[in-house]
Curated annotation (Swiss-Prot):
Pathway: Secondary metabolite biosynthesis; flavonoid biosynthesis. It comes from Pisum sativum. The primary product of this enzyme is 4,2',4',6'-tetrahydroxychalcone (also termed naringenin-chalcone or chalcone) which can under specific conditions spontaneously isomerize into naringenin. It is an enzyme of class 2 (transferase). GO terms for molecular function: naringenin-chalcone synthase activity. Its EC number is 2.3.1.74. GO terms for biological process: flavonoid biosynthetic process; polyketide biosynthetic process. Belongs to the thiolase-like superfamily. Chalcone/stilbene synthases family. This is Chalcone synthase 4. The gene is CHS4. Keywords: Acyltransferase, Flavonoid biosynthesis, Transferase. It catalyses: (E)-4-coumaroyl-CoA + 3 malonyl-CoA + 3 H(+) = 2',4,4',6'-tetrahydroxychalcone + 3 CO2 + 4 CoA. Pfam families: Chal_sti_synt_C, Chal_sti_synt_N.
Amino acid sequence: MVSVSEIRKAQRAEGPATILAIGTANPANCVEQSTYPDFYFRITNSEHKIELKQKFQRMCDKSMINRRYMYLTEEILKENPSVCEYMAPSLDARQDMVVVEVPRLGKEAAVKAIKEWGQPKSKITHLIFCTTSGVDMPGADYQLTKLLGLRPYVKRYMMYQQGCFAGGTVLRLAKDLAENNKGARVLVVCSEVTAVTFRGPSDTHLDSLVGQALFGDGAAALIVGSDPLPEIEKPIFEMVWTAQTIAPDSEGAIDGHLREAGLTFHLLKDVPAIVSKNIDKALVEAFQPLGISDYNSIFWIAHPGGPAILDQVEQKLALKPEKMKATREVLSEYGNMSSACVLFILDEMRRKSIQNGLKTTGEGLEWGVLFGFGPGLTIETVVLHSVVI
């Protein structure tokens, strides 16, 4: 008779979870940050709020964002005036948009990832879907399974309302699934659409205005599995270690509430300080076992919640400016796409590493870190090992 320990041993993969493919997608509607204040105040019938518009213009100018992509076009917003008001009951209109668009955009990214992976979609064993944009039953995971034509017995995991740290969360979960289920191939999808958070400006709630200056739409998809098939699957990054922690004394620093007016976010001004204060401890826990204490010797992927967070982390750790190059590039070209951001940065980094003729997918370096920051204040940490190009 076979023992439980023998069964468990046979169920486990031998090697670490590995990212085998990455795909990304954005809505067709591209919004230039330089002209966005004019559009935003016009479409929300707020052009009379001259001082507030000037404040918003300064926010956009300081955001380090050049452009964003948004599902919400002028035509859609004109058809849904309640979405343009500040805190007007509008949840039905928002939900009707995102329950369709979130899985659709996710499919676009997933198709690209599956194509790069090069294996038939019938080999996908697990699906992790993550979004902070809208809620429905059956969920976006079910809708994506139908859209892609995946097998009905794919094991699905649906993560709603996690926020900006969740790009790290999906990697942590995918790692555990791949390493504990021999032969598993996990499709990971993060899809975010700002139709749930868009609203007009308010003189009394400037933190809402910050979100209007930063958030953009995007979806990213990965294929994750252990023990890649030689000559068939091409590893991009290995995931070696993960952690999640709640920063001390950070309650209320970032929170979101889904109500009749849609999803509202509240940010305290000291969010960058809280992140930078706690990042050193997270790094020590992650890299001390590897004998690494020079954080300029590793590659960096950090959720770009905004330029102030990146600036303070750089300052706290005395990081060289080039360490955050891939992160800042994604912020500049796409804005803050919540959970999808860090996956876009993974893609950006491996592409630039190949283009620049570097030795590894991690900017020529062996080890790296991926950080997610979000409501809680929650910090996700993933230790990555690059792959020789």
